[in-house]
Amino acid sequence: MAIGKRLKKAREGVDRTKLYPLDEAVKMVKERATSKFDETIEVALNLGVDPRHADQMVRGVVMLPNGTGRTLRVGVFARGAKADEAKAAGADVVGAEDLVEQVQGGNINFDRCIATPDMMPLVGRLGKVLGPRGMMPNPKIGTVTMDVAGAVKGAKGGSVEFRVEKAGIVQAGVGKASFTEEKLVENIKALADAVTKAKPTGAKGTYIQRVAVSSSMGPGVKVEPGSIH
């Protein structure tokens, strides 16, 4: 079936003017995830912030209770014993100057990047490469740390980084269509709680204004904001 026809069929029964309770919205999205691959379930939170102002930036990391259903490749910048710890914890790529050279050459074989604090002067050279990809290590979200083993295990185990975009939206994958409705709801609530805890001091008025759930190839379903906590 052509994508256009599939999407048109999937939109049937979805009232685009209605706000659905979270559990009902998740059920509808799962029922409409009919692609041959296991679609990712995504959440978009429209926040009452303007990220152009430093005191309204929202970012953080959350450990989803049921994982993401996706296996992340993790790269670690570390030396010596910390490099050994990273490897033992399951990091896919570990290095120092050699890894910096690889990344500078466009060879990025990881999805999440972690670094020990002493490596940051070196990793800082990669800002133009890693920054636009949202992969620059940052102590605020636990990716610049001496506990490289914990960070690697977290990334592999279902931790999700989130950051508000220019339009004031936080988007994140919260699982797969093959997950049960209950597991998806738990993951979405964990994300919403983490975003709420990350509320910046400069945020005024209603913080979480609009919520939508969708699958990779399916329509968005609007959610009652009050049902996500």
Swiss-Prot record:
SUPFAM superfamilies: Ribosomal protein L1 (SSF56808)
Keywords: Repressor, Ribonucleoprotein, Ribosomal protein, RNA-binding, rRNA-binding, Translation regulation, tRNA-binding
Gene Ontology biological process: regulation of translation; translation
PROSITE patterns noted in UniProt: RIBOSOMAL_L1
Molecular-function annotations in GO: rRNA binding; structural constituent of ribosome; tRNA binding
Annotated Gene3D superfamilies: 3.30.190.20, 3.40.50.790
Keyword rRNA-binding in annotation: yes
CDD domains reported in the protein's UniProt record: Ribosomal_L1
Ribonucleoprotein as UniProt keyword: yes
Membrane-spanning parts: none
A Gene Ontology term for the protein's cellular component: cytosolic large ribosomal subunit
UniProt cross-references to Pfam families, sorted A to Z: Ribosomal_L1
Description of how the protein assembles with itself and partners: Part of the 50S ribosomal subunit.
NCBIfam families documented for this protein: rplA_bact
Family: Belongs to the universal ribosomal protein uL1 family.
HAMAP family: Ribosomal_uL1_B
Role, per record: Binds directly to 23S rRNA. The L1 stalk is quite mobile in the ribosome, and is involved in E site tRNA release.
Designated name of the protein: Large ribosomal subunit protein uL1
Natural source organism: Rhodopseudomonas palustris (strain BisB5)
